[in-house]
Amino acid sequence: MGNVVHDSFRVMSPFNAYRETEFMSDSLPAKPAENSVDLTFLARKPSFLECDDAAAFLHGMKFEANTEVLWFILKNSQGRYFCAEFVEPNALKVDNDGDPADDALFVSMCSRGRLCVPVGYTVAASFHSHPPADQGLQESSAEWSYRNRFFTCYDLWKVINTRRSYSRCYLSTGKDGLISYNSNASDFERELSRHLAKKTDGSSRLFQSLYERGGIPASIWMLLAIGAGELKMVVKGIVKDAMWSRRGALEASWKWDIDPNQVKSSSVELMPIFSPVFSDVAGIAACLRIRRRDSFAEQSAGVILKHNFRDEFIATAAEPCDYVNFDLAVVFPKDQHGNVQLPEGFRVYGFYHSSKPSLPDLLPPSDAERFENFFSPVDMKVSFDRLVAAPQHHVLMLTPDNAVLSFSQPDIPVRSLIVELTQDFQHKVISGEITTQMFVDKVAAAGNLSVLLPSKTWPDVGRIRPSVEVVTVIAERAE
């Protein structure tokens, strides 16, 4: 299950190469997104703040189409979460006690019929993705679609039966989003589990058998699940006809909620999805580059947080939006007093955003490639305004050619440059009155402009220094 790697990678898998159970994550390799990169990274045992974050990371992986996928999310004694692939028993190396080696981070089924997990971890949740089921003879297209976008009876039975090993499960439906079910051990749930349990001969009971053949409407099964436990949309769908386009709890009124004619609530219910925990901002930069959207048709932005007392960094998942309109309230919920809520112990370190695609007629006559792979004058002004209000913050930008640029520590020239950027500065660059290099020099002279991850346009990692001419002009103005 979970065929996301080729056999060659299975042989070379580094799952057994890390004996220490540290909960900090190493920096990601600076490579474009691909499953081998994700798997190599997961072999390093990256930790996540919440179970939802780990599930969302798995949801972002590109699994082989039309295959059964099963992973588990583990929790360690420090309360951090980790991703672990399910490995069939015949492919698992175990010690003399029948348990997997304590340096391995995968889950298997032991001979005694229980889940085997690495020492120091417990199972927090299962993660599933299923191939499409065949449509039933009397099943409508709508109900068939619902059935292919919801948990199977067996998925939920595993978390609601009295002998369960974990009480939460996730289902990835690709571009239709990620949903979760959390058991609340209700009387209704216990009664439902009796009707989902296998018969003594191992065969399915009538309800499950009918449902799997399309004989029971999926919408009825969904209502039963909603009444039994806690269902929520963890990652919303990104396709036009996604069943759920809003994160949050799924209620019995879910059909009404997905009606395109209904007015959607704009309030944020849940904490945003966060990246793994990193020990430095370079790890965040690499993660953003690997997990960036495949399409550059729209701009996206997010927030970077740092722990108040430890070198721990996390970033929110990218939110499609214009950077100029982005702020904390876009992704974070508010308390009863209207204050933005952050994870306990964390503060805002800065913001990140991708570039906004430029139309061909809005490019300068020369050095257009550098202009496209740099902060736009409009976005730069937004960042300057933020940094004047909070000088301790940092701004990261992901360029189209996969560089990650950073600006921080604003200096005195920032205020004068803000004024200059409001006076149709972009038109002057496009017309050639101001060259792209002059714009880069002005920004470099106004603070710490750096390349965190290189690209063709920005091949050298480190601080970008302004030219001598720009420095001289600024010094004369200061006098």
Spans of features found by a protein language model:
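Active-site-proximal loop/helix of nucleotide/amide-processing enzymes and allied scaffolds
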Residues: 106-252, 256, 331-479
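Glycine-rich short-loop/terminal segments
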Residues: 2-122, 204-345, 437-479
